[in-house]
Amino acid sequence: MRERVAMPIKIPDHLPAKEILLKENIFIMDESRAYTQDIRPLKICILNLMPTKQETETQLLRLLGNTPLQVDVSLLHPSTHSPRNTSKEHLNLFYKTIDEVKQQKFDGMIITGAPVETLPFHDVNYWNEMTSILDWTTTNVTSTLHICWGAQAGLYHHYGIKKKPLTTKLFGVYSHKLEVKNVNLLRGFDDVFYAPHSRHTTVSREDIERVDELIVLSSSEEAGVYIASSKDGKRVFVMGHSEYDAHTLKQEYERDVKRGIACDPPFNYFPEGNVDALPPLQWRAHSNLLFSNWLNYYVYQETPYHLDD
């Protein structure tokens, strides 16, 4: 086992998330400073499919920066989709497409959720590109962490597991339990822990358990399967949003109300049911442990020192 040394996360110069993370005392390093350090950081790419790209960047970088490992992050977006909520200037400055990195290998990859879950996969306008990216991860990434719709897309493409519509939106903060205890990804997890969900579709436990290569790691009575993975750890599927900030569900609720969409307040979220109050962050410890375990045990401990090996 390699010795672990406290190291920062390396991010692009001038990325807006930098100032937020510095104020939160997250250990980060910009590119120009990182060049003076003679070590190999972990190469992590993030395929950011969320409409609120800058907020998602901050959420994920916060978690990756709270580990004792130096991480070099590349941000990716689909070239076949033009986001409405992110400027072209931001994308041009900080993002790459798969064509620009497909000859490279990465230690780890994160594929985010996306607001397209009610569409059939093949109706998503970047689905063909998405399948190419998922195929690419098999040969070019040591371990890939899929989140929410990203998890559903990965399960469908790699294993043929279909998502199923829910009668009502699964929306709130739910308790979860461990299904197994001798798996590195779950090291240090509480027996019961909380995480947010925000989705209109689900994947059934029975469908996952029919695939010999997969294992269910954590579940919720209300929310169903929460974490599943391939038995070799190369693919991890998280159905919820442990990366969310305390206010994220509140913003989603207020957005839907403003649009006139019938929507109940998030379950187990607002203090005493007061929708004007800022809820406490009940899942911070779980989220940090999930990402640090993935980064350490499934990426750092498994990746070759020379990525081309």
From Swiss-Prot:
Its EC number is 2.3.1.31. It is an enzyme of class 2 (transferase). Pathway: Amino-acid biosynthesis; L-methionine biosynthesis via de novo pathway; O-acetyl-L-homoserine from L-homoserine: step 1/1. The active site is at 148 (acyl-thioester intermediate), 241 (proton acceptor), 243. Its main location: cytoplasm. It is found in: Cytoplasm. Pfam families: HTS. The keyword Plastid does not apply. GO terms for cellular component: cytoplasm. The record marks 117 as: Important for acyl-CoA specificity. The record marks 198 as: Important for substrate specificity. Substrate binds at residues 169, 198, 255. InterPro entries: Class_I_gatase-like, HST_MetA, MetA_family. It catalyses: L-homoserine + acetyl-CoA = O-acetyl-L-homoserine + CoA. Keywords: Acyltransferase, Amino-acid biosynthesis, Cytoplasm, Methionine biosynthesis, Transferase. Belongs to the MetA family. Transfers an acetyl group from acetyl-CoA to L-homoserine, forming acetyl-L-homoserine. In vitro, can also use propionyl-CoA as acyl donor. This is Homoserine O-acetyltransferase. It comes from Shouchella clausii (Alkalihalobacillus clausii).
